[in-house]
Amino acid sequence: MLDPNLLRTEPDAVAEKLARRGFKLDVDKLVALEERRKVLQVKTENLQAERNSRSKSIGQAKARGEDIEPLRLEVNKLGEELDAAKNELDALLAEIRDIALTLPNLPDDEVPLGKDDSENVEVSRWGTPRKFDFEIRDHVTLGETLGGLDFASAVKLTGSRFVVMKGQIARLHRALSQFMLDLHTEEHGYSENYVPYLVNHDTLYGTGQLPKFAGDLFHTRPLEEEADSSNYALIPTAEVPLTNLVRDEIIDEESLPIKMTAHTPCFRSEAGSYGRDTRGLIRMHQFDKVEMVQVVRPEDSMQALEEMTGHAEKVLQLLGLPYRKVLLCSGDMGFGARKTYDLEVWLPAQDTYREISSCSNMWDFQARRMQARCRSKSDKKTRLVHTLNGSGLAVGRTLVAVLENYQQADGRIEIPEVLRPYMKGLEFIG
C-alpha cells in the first residue's frame, strides 16, 4: 500500500508515477475525499471536546445543588452527534483505504517507461544456445516418449493444466528442487522454511493478492462469504506465507537482513491466460517453485535486489542453461513491485527465451500493509522494513529447460553434472 501521507500531500506526483504504469488515478476524487476527511476530523474533535466539557459541568453543577437535567440532555445530544460524526468519518476512511488498496506500487526512477513486455530492457546474457544437428523435440514430446510426463492421466484426475510425472522424470523434478534449496541455504545464506499451503485473507492482503487479484486464487469458500477462521486460499507462491512471517512484528535492525527460502507447490487459476501456453508445463494450475524472500533495512533494498537476482542466476549457471536478464518496464511490473528483473531461459523448441524467475523489490509496499517494522538499538523510533522476493527457480519450467537443452539425438536426456549426486550418479534418462 502506498504511503497515505504521500497521497494526501502529493496526489499529482503520485498520479504522474502511476500513469507510467498505465494506471489512472482520480486525483479530483482523492482531493475531495481528503478535504471531507479534514472537515469531519475537526468536527469530531470539536464535538468530543464539547462533550467532555459539558460532562465536567454536570459534576460541578451537581456540587452546587443546581438542576443538572438540562446539562444531561445536552450531553446526551452531543453524544449522539459525536457518534454520527465518528460513523461518517469511519465510513470515509474506509472508502479512502479501499481506494489505496487498489493502487499499485510506484515505479522506481530507474524503471524504463513502457506499456508491456515488448518494451522491457535486456540487461545481459549468459551462455550460448546449443546448436543441434538433429530435429529438436519439445519437452512434451520428450517427456511423453520417455514415459515421464502424463498429461492424459492428469486430465482424467483433475482437468487441463495439470500433469502426472513418473519415474526418472519425477525424480529429476525432485532433484532440481533439492539442488536449489541446498544452493540457497548452504551458499547464499537463506534459512529453509516449511510453510502452510493454505492461508487466510489477512495474509493475502499483507502481500497484495487481495483485494485486487482474488480471481487468480483458488478459495476454499466463495470469496463473497464473510471471512472467518475457515476461509482460506491456496498459496499462489511461497512469497505469501514467507513474507507474512514478519507481519505485525518489530524487528531489531541488527538482525536484518532476514533471508528465507521454501519449496512449495503454487496454485493459480490463470484466469487471464485463456488460450496461452496450453501445451506442456509452461503455464499450470499447480506447479512447484523454490522461493527466496528477503526482509531488509530500507537503505539496503536495492543492493539486496541485485544480490537476490544473482542468486537466481547462479542456479541457471550451475545447470549450464543459457539465459538473459531483463529489466521490466513500468507497464509490465507486478502490482506490488517497485523494480523487477526477470530471468528468461533459452528453450530450443520454442527458439526463444521464456521467463523462469522474477525478482522484485517491493520497497515498503507490503510492509505497510503488514505493519512490519524495524528499530535500531540507538533509536526508539520504528520504521517500515523493505521486502523482496524472487523465484529461485520455478521448478517445472527449469525441468522444461533441462529436457530441451540436454536432449540427445536418440531421445535420451543428459543429466546436468550438478544434479547427478541427487540422481544416484545417473548420467542419462532413457
UniProtKB/Swiss-Prot annotation:
<keyword id="KW-0963">Cytoplasm</keyword>
<comment type="similarity">
    <text>Belongs to the class-II aminoacyl-tRNA synthetase family. Type-1 seryl-tRNA synthetase subfamily.</text>
</comment>
<feature type="binding site">
    <location>
        <position position="291"/>
    </location>
    <ligand>
        <name>L-serine</name>
    </ligand>
</feature>
<comment type="subunit">
    <text>Homodimer. The tRNA molecule binds across the dimer.</text>
</comment>
<keyword id="KW-0067">ATP-binding</keyword>
<dbReference type="InterPro" id="IPR002317">
    <property type="entry name" value="Ser-tRNA-ligase_type_1"/>
</dbReference>
<comment type="pathway">
    <text>Aminoacyl-tRNA biosynthesis; selenocysteinyl-tRNA(Sec) biosynthesis; L-seryl-tRNA(Sec) from L-serine and tRNA(Sec): step 1/1.</text>
</comment>
<dbReference type="InterPro" id="IPR045864">
    <property type="entry name" value="aa-tRNA-synth_II/BPL/LPL"/>
</dbReference>
<dbReference type="InterPro" id="IPR006195">
    <property type="entry name" value="aa-tRNA-synth_II"/>
</dbReference>
<dbReference type="InterPro" id="IPR042103">
    <property type="entry name" value="SerRS_1_N_sf"/>
</dbReference>
<keyword id="KW-0648">Protein biosynthesis</keyword>
<dbReference type="Pfam" id="PF00587">
    <property type="entry name" value="tRNA-synt_2b"/>
</dbReference>
<feature type="binding site">
    <location>
        <position position="391"/>
    </location>
    <ligand>
        <name>L-serine</name>
    </ligand>
</feature>
<dbReference type="InterPro" id="IPR002314">
    <property type="entry name" value="aa-tRNA-synt_IIb"/>
</dbReference>
<feature type="binding site">
    <location>
        <begin position="268"/>
        <end position="270"/>
    </location>
    <ligand>
        <name>ATP</name>
    </ligand>
</feature>
<dbReference type="GO" id="GO:0004828">
    <property type="term" value="F:serine-tRNA ligase activity"/>
</dbReference>
<dbReference type="GO" id="GO:0005737">
    <property type="term" value="C:cytoplasm"/>
</dbReference>
<dbReference type="GO" id="GO:0006434">
    <property type="term" value="P:seryl-tRNA aminoacylation"/>
</dbReference>
<dbReference type="GO" id="GO:0005524">
    <property type="term" value="F:ATP binding"/>
</dbReference>
<protein>
    <recommendedName>
        <fullName>Serine--tRNA ligase</fullName>
        <ecNumber>6.1.1.11</ecNumber>
    </recommendedName>
</protein>
<dbReference type="InterPro" id="IPR033729">
    <property type="entry name" value="SerRS_core"/>
</dbReference>
<keyword id="KW-0436">Ligase</keyword>
<dbReference type="InterPro" id="IPR015866">
    <property type="entry name" value="Ser-tRNA-synth_1_N"/>
</dbReference>
<feature type="binding site">
    <location>
        <begin position="355"/>
        <end position="358"/>
    </location>
    <ligand>
        <name>ATP</name>
    </ligand>
</feature>
<comment type="function">
    <text>Catalyzes the attachment of serine to tRNA(Ser). Is also able to aminoacylate tRNA(Sec) with serine, to form the misacylated tRNA L-seryl-tRNA(Sec), which will be further converted into selenocysteinyl-tRNA(Sec).</text>
</comment>
<keyword id="KW-0030">Aminoacyl-tRNA synthetase</keyword>
<keyword id="KW-0547">Nucleotide-binding</keyword>
<dbReference type="Pfam" id="PF02403">
    <property type="entry name" value="Seryl_tRNA_N"/>
</dbReference>
<feature type="binding site">
    <location>
        <begin position="237"/>
        <end position="239"/>
    </location>
    <ligand>
        <name>L-serine</name>
    </ligand>
</feature>
<dbReference type="InterPro" id="IPR010978">
    <property type="entry name" value="tRNA-bd_arm"/>
</dbReference>
<dbReference type="GO" id="GO:0016260">
    <property type="term" value="P:selenocysteine biosynthetic process"/>
</dbReference>
